[in-house]
Regions:
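Residue-level detector of functional hotspots within protein domains
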Residues: 16, 28, 33-35, 40, ...
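Short, conserved structural patches
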Residues: 2-10, 62-231
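Generic anion/oxyanion-binding catalytic loop in active/binding sites
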Residues: 13, 46, 208
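Aliphatic-rich helix starts adjacent to a transmembrane/signal segment
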Residues: 2, 21-22, 26-33, 38-72
Length: 231
């Protein structure tokens, strides 16, 4: 009986030694902590890069709006519309909202063509983009690309809104619009976080850290000379 008990103890001793063995625990603990530390540090770096891109987008939009108010309108109608001939006003008479109702012309690009459209346009006003306007649109995109090289024409929208400024017979455009530049559908793609946390799936099976679509960035200024030549 004593021999059997001794044999049982002898058989369990390797298991007990294994459960009490502490060799290698430091390496395991280091590996676990290092992964979390690595994700934390590079997560901070990537979010810092995202905020830098966010601020760059805001600044680029403001720069583009500043350029747009000093350039030919993308919509050729602002150059051709006459407060005298089309609205029946006397030379020098202000073009108020009572004379010409508020309207907005929106210009965008599909990557090939620049198009402008609007609703409630006054009689005699054509929203279509002209040659000078297409140059302006391209220049606006180029201005944004100085800070954000990955931006394309499809990300940019230029709007012109009649807000009751201008006068008949004014040099340049009779109507002085509020010019708005919008930067849309700008995305920031995560790299490090996507690698380490990509196993966490969001709706549709996409990695939750894959990318973030930023909100639209908008900058508006009242039109100035609206003439690239400065005349």
């Amino acid at each position: 009986m004593k021999n059997a008990t001794s044999a049982n103890r002898s058989g369990l001793s390797p298991l007990r030694r294994l459960t009490r063995d502490r060799f290698g625990t430091t390496a395991i603990e280091f590996a676990l902590v290092f992964v979390l530390f690595f994700v934390f540090v590079f997560g901070i770096i990537e979010y810092a890069l995202m905020m830098w891109r966010w601020n760059s987008a805001e600044t680029a939009t403001q720069m583009a709006a500043r350029l747009a108010v000093q350039s030919d309108p993308v919509s050729g109608g602002f150059n051709s519309y006459s407060g005298v001939a089309d609205a029946g006003l006397g030379p020098g008479q202000s073009i108020t909202l009572a004379d010409v109702a508020a309207f907005t012309v929106t210009c965008s690009s599909d990557g090939t063509d620049v198009t402008c459209s609007g609703s409630g346009l006054p009689a005699g006003f054509s929203a279509a983009a002209d040659a000078e306007g297409i140059v302006t649109f391209d220049n606006v995109v180029t201005e944004i690309q100085k800070l954000l090289p990955t931006v394309t024409e499809q990300n940019v929208i230029v709007e012109y809104s009649h807000i009751g400024l201008g006068f008949a017979g004014r040099p340049g455009t009779d109507i002085v619009p509020l010019v708005t530049v919008r930067l849309t559908n700008l995305q920031f793609d995560f790299i490090i976080l996507d690698i380490f946390l990509g196993v966490l799936r969001g709706p549709g099976g996409a990695p939750v850290t894959d990318s973030i679509t930023m909100p639209a960035f908008t900058a508006s200024l009242t039109g100035e000379d609206l003439d690239t030549s400065g005349i």
